[in-house]
């Protein structure tokens, strides 16, 4: 959402994004649940999103598993109709990503790069969002690999059970 909002609304959008991100992490307005995905809706401005947490997480440093502190790890698809945001994909790894190091998203045999900013990462364009959503609808799981600013390699696996139904519900609620 940051990418789309920043392009359409400048600085005001950055504030709006921060607010939407905060709502995405703290909202209790769950309107539906589709297996491993939850659907949220907020008003003023109207925004809808689906979110899932990982089913498996692996943290490695120096080739060895390590225990690390991470905040919420979530995969999102967001709709913000007032800003023209229609199905923007994003990921938060629960830590600051290593700057200028792409985050990889693999669904089946398809891999996409996502670009980090702080604790969040997004695809490079709305066209890539569309490709990713299409892959997510066909897939069984999504694997996100990233590197923290401290050098920890993380691998987070998300189930895609319920993704298509949750996405359809969010689209319907945020036309």
Predicted features, each with a name:
Residues 1-4:
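Positively charged n-region of N-terminal signal peptides that target proteins for export
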Residues 8-19:
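Bacterial N-terminal signal peptides
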Residues 23-175:
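A generic "folded-domain core" signal
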């Amino acid at each position: 959402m940051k990418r789309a909002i920043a392009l359409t609304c400048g600085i005001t959008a950055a504030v709006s994004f921060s607010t939407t991100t905060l709502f995405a992490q703290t909202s209790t307005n769950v309107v539906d649940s589709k297996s491993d995905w939850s659907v949220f809706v907020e008003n003023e401005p109207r925004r809808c999103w689906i979110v899932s947490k990982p089913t498996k997480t692996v943290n490695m440093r120096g080739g060895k598993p390590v225990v690390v502190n991470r905040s919420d790890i979530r995969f999102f698809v967001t709709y913000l109709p007032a800003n023209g945001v229609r199905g923007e994909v994003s990921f938060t790894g629960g830590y600051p990503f290593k700057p200028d190091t792409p985050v990889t998203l693999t669904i089946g045999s398809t891999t996409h790069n996502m670009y980090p900013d702080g604790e969040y990462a997004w695809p490079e364009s709305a066209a890539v969002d569309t490709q990713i959503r299409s892959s997510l609808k066909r897939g069984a799981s999504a694997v996100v690999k990233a590197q923290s600013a401290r050098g920890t390699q993380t691998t987070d696996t998300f189930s895609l059970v319920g993704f298509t139904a949750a996405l359809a519900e969010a689209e319907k609620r945020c036309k």
